[in-house]
């Protein structure tokens, strides 16, 4: 019988060298994300979001990235969810993209800020109708007695707002403003390539690049 200790893959698809890396991490992320899209990976926009609650207990979940620019990485959620409460007391978080088919990870750490109401309104209006209704119907992370309760709420919201539900006040965007971004490329014999971008106001591009030992 195969044991967990025997499960392993020898990575060999690509390398990551300082000479080929972009001078700023957003350009490097854009390059890798486009390669993930070109490779037709299933949902390359999924990422793990890790937060810490008031009691110091960490939690993690998969969310979808909805925007990236030089300001940071944007996602949207219910502000009253567990992650919303975590971020209210500890506005620091970590993101992880894992593209196993390309043998790559991107690890991002930084502070969290809410997006503007205008940004949240604009994205909310672009969502499918069912998702907009669902944002009202679901008290995310709260205990409910049955699926029927959720479906009854969905029906009530649909009847109330029809085809034009407004954005709920408890729903909107967050932006992670990174202070470090690590790009990890799997290599043979577990001697992986790891390049860490650290925010540095004294550096010409605003970032320094360091190679980390695997």
Swiss-Prot record:
Q: Which cofactor does it need?
A: FMN
**GO term, biological process aspect, one:** pyridoxine biosynthetic process
Q: Give the catalytic activity.
A: pyridoxamine 5'-phosphate + O2 + H2O = pyridoxal 5'-phosphate + H2O2 + NH4(+); pyridoxine 5'-phosphate + O2 = pyridoxal 5'-phosphate + H2O2
Q: Which positions in this protein are listed as binding substrate?
A: 8-11, 66, 123, 127, 131, 190-192
Q: In which pathway does it act?
A: Cofactor metabolism; pyridoxal 5'-phosphate salvage; pyridoxal 5'-phosphate from pyridoxamine 5'-phosphate: step 1/1; Cofactor metabolism; pyridoxal 5'-phosphate salvage; pyridoxal 5'-phosphate from pyridoxine 5'-phosphate: step 1/1
Question: Member of which family?
Answer: Belongs to the pyridoxamine 5'-phosphate oxidase family.
Q: What is this protein called?
A: Pyridoxine/pyridoxamine 5'-phosphate oxidase
Positions that bind FMN: 61-66, 76-77, 82-83, 105, 140-141, 184, 194
What is the protein's known function?
Catalyzes the oxidation of either pyridoxine 5'-phosphate (PNP) or pyridoxamine 5'-phosphate (PMP) into pyridoxal 5'-phosphate (PLP).
Per the entry, the cofactor note is:
Binds 1 FMN per subunit.
List the molecular function annotations (GO) for this entry. Answer: FMN binding; pyridoxamine phosphate oxidase activity
Note the HAMAP family from the entry.
PdxH
Check the record and name the InterPro entries matching this protein: Pyridox_Oxase, Pyridox_Oxase_CS, Pyridox_Oxase_N, Pyridoxamine_oxidase_dimer_C, Split_barrel_FMN-bd
Q: Which gene encodes it?
A: pdxH
Alphabetical keyword list: Flavoprotein, FMN, Oxidoreductase, Pyridoxine biosynthesis
User: According to the lineage, what is the superkingdom?
Assistant: Bacteria
* UniProt keyword Oxidoreductase, yes or no: yes
Stated EC number for the protein is 1.4.3.5
Q: Which PROSITE patterns match?
A: PYRIDOX_OXIDASE
